A protein has these predicted regions:
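A structural "domain/chain start" motif
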Residues: 4-49, 53, 58-61, 106-109, ...
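Compositionally biased, intrinsically disordered linkers/stalks adjacent to structured regions
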Residues: 132-154
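Conserved acidic
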Residues: 32, 36, 40, 93, ...
Length: 154
C-alpha cells in the first residue's frame, strides 16, 4: 500500500470574500521593551500572509487592517526551582515571559471589527539566560490566537 502526503493551507480561511489584502500596523508599545513592536508586527504579518492567505497592502489600499497594543511585558518570572542540599541554596531552573496584548482585525470597507481580543495574556517558558526562547514561544501563541480566532469568527 502506498501512502501519499497531503499538503493543505488556508486560502482565505473563512474570511469574508471581500477580504483579500491586509495591512498590519505597528502595535502600540506601552512597555519599556522597544524591540517588541517590530517583533510582534513581523510575526503577525507573516502569519496573516502565510496562514490566512492574505496579501500585504498599504493601510490605504488594504481590505482589512490588524492593529493592537502591547500593554505589558514581564520577561523574568521564576516558575521552577532546584534545591542543592549540600549548600542549602535554591536556584531558578525555569523562567517565564508574559506579554499582554489587545488585537483587532478591522474590515476597512465596512468599518467594523471582524475579530478582536482585549488583554490577551501570552506566556513562554525558558531556561535561565534564554529569554529570547521564551519570548518566541509567547509570540508563537499570539500568532496562533489571531489565526484561530479569526478563522473561527468569520
Amino acid at each position: 500500500m502506498l501512502l501519499g502526503g497531503c499538503l493543505y493551507g488556508f486560502a482565505g480561511g473563512g474570511l469574508p470574500p471581500s477580504i483579500k489584502t491586509v495591512a498590519v500596523l505597528p502595535f502600540d508599545n506601552q512597555t519599556p521593551e522597544p524591540t517588541l513592536t517590530q517583533e510582534v508586527s513581523v510575526a503577525v504579518r507573516e502569519a496573516v500572509q502565510s496562514r490566512l492567505g492574505l496579501r500585504e497592502a498599504s493601510e490605504n489600499q488594504a481590505d482589512a487592517v490588524v492593529r493592537g497594543t502591547i500593554s505589558r511585558y514581564e520577561p523574568d518570572l521564576p516558575v521552577a526551582y532546584q534545591g542543592n542540599t549540600e549548600n542549602n541554596q535554591v536556584t531558578v531552573s525555569r523562567r517565564l515571559v508574559q506579554i499582554t496584548v489587545s488585537v483587532e482585525i478591522l474590515d476597512q470597507r465596512r468599518g467594523k471589527a471582524l475579530w478582536s481580543r482585549s488583554g490577551l495574556l501570552l506566556e513562554g517558558d525558558y531556561s535561565p539566560g534564554q529569554e529570547r526562547d521564551g519570548r518566541q514561544k509567547a509570540l508563537d501563541k499570539l500568532v496562533t490566537n489571531i489565526v484561530e480566532g479569526a478563522q473561527s469568527q468569520w
